[in-house]
């Protein structure tokens, strides 16, 4: 959700309860050495609308509920490693920060797993 298509809208009333913030990626130096184009891709130039980490379970529960009600019984989860470049900004949306790299991926994976287990 946080990656290739710009994330969620930070201006949409439908997402307001999820407290999204526009977040700029911070690719590691070693990643930029092998993929320098990351400095000028759309996410780097414009940021990505990320959901407040405290609202991830709510987001995935809503999305999975909608998909299940529509008859979808499976999804492919892809691109999770793209979340490693996004740290939740200190103080954004009432957050006290959520780090980046593995902690951001872990938060998303745990929220997805909790959502589909219901």
Question: How should each PLM-predicted stretch be described?
Answer:
Residues 1-118:
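Aromatic- and carboxylate-enriched substrate-binding clefts and catalytic-loop regions
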């Amino acid at each position: 959700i946080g990656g290739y298509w710009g994330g969620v809208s930070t201006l949409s009333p439908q997402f307001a309860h999820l407290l999204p913030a526009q977040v700029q990626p911070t690719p590691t130096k070693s990643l930029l050495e092998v993929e320098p184009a990351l400095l000028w891709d759309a996410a780097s130039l414009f940021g990505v609308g990320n959901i407040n980490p405290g609202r991830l379970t709510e987001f995935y529960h809503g999305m999975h509920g909608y998909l299940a009600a529509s008859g979808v019984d499976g999804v492919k989860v892809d691109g999770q490693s793209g979340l490693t470049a996004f740290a939740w900004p200190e103080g954004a949306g009432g957050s006290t920060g959520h780090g980046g790299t593995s902690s951001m991926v872990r938060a998303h994976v745990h929220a997805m797993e909790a959502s589909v287990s219901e």
